[in-house]
C-alpha cells in the first residue's frame, strides 16, 4: 500500500533475495542479491538501496527480536519460572537494544539470547536447547528481516523522489 507496488509483483521480484536469506541465515550475505532484485525488478534507485539495504542488514533485526521474546517466555513457562510484568518490560527493552546489536550472520542471536536468558533467570541448560533449534528459527527470521529491508526500499522509492 505504501510502496504502491502489488504484493504479487513485490514477492516475485524479491524471491531470489528471500531464498538466499533463508538458505544462508545471513542478512549481510544477502546484500548484493537484495540490491540487484529491487534495483532491476522494482526500479528502486541505487542511491536508496546503497543506504537502506546495508543499514537494514545491520540494524533491522525485528524478526530476531520477536523470536527471542517468544523463546524466553516459552522456556520460562517450560521451566515453571514466573515472569512478572515488570520483568517482561525489562526483557522487552533489553531485547530491542540487543537485537539492534545482533550481527547479521548465522547464529548471531545466540549471545543476545544468552544475555536475555540470564536476565530472565532461566537455567543454563536452556541454552543447549536454544542452540539446537536456532538454525531452523534463524532461517525464517533472516528471511523476514530481509523482506522488511526490501519493503523499506520500495516505500522510500515512492516517498523520496530522486532525480537520476
Where are these predicted regions, by residue range?
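A short, ordered amphipathic alpha-helix with a cationic face
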Residues: 6-7, 24, 102-103
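Membrane-interacting alpha-helical segments
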Residues: 12-15, 19, 23, 137, ...
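Helix-loop-helix junctions within the multi-pass membrane cores of secondary transporters/permeases
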Residues: 16-99, 153, 164
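Transmembrane alpha-helical segments and their short flanking loops
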Residues: 69-164
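Signature of multi-pass transmembrane helix bundles
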Residues: 1-10
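Alpha-helical structural context
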Residues: 1-2, 41, 78, 119
Amino acid at each position: 500500500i505504501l510502496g504502491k507496488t502489488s504484493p504479487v509483483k513485490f514477492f516475485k521480484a524479491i524471491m531470489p533475495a528471500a531464498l538466499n536469506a533463508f538458505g544462508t541465515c545471513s542478512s549481510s550475505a544477502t546484500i548484493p542479491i537484495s540490491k540487484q532484485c529491487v534495483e532491476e525488478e522494482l526500479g528502486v534507485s541505487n542511491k536508496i538501496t546503497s543506504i537502506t539495504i546495508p543499514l537494514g542488514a545491520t540494524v533491522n533485526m525485528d524478526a530476531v527480536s520477536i523470536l527471542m521474546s517468544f523463546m524466553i517466555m516459552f522456556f520460562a513457562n517450560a521451566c515453571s519460572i514466573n515472569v512478572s510484568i515488570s520483568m517482561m518490560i525489562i526483557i522487552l527493552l533489553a531485547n530491542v537494544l540487543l537485537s539492534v546489536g545482533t550481527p547479521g550472520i548465522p547464529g548471531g542471536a545466540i549471545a543476545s539470547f544468552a544475555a536475555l536468558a540470564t536476565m530472565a533467570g532461566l537455567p543454563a541448560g536452556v541454552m543447549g536447547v536454544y542452540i539446537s533449534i536456532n538454525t531452523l528459527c534463524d532461517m525464517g527470521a533472516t528471511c523476514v528481516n530481509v523482506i522488511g529491508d526490501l519493503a523499506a526500499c520500495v516505500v522510500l522509492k515512492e516517498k523520496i523522489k530522486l532525480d537520476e
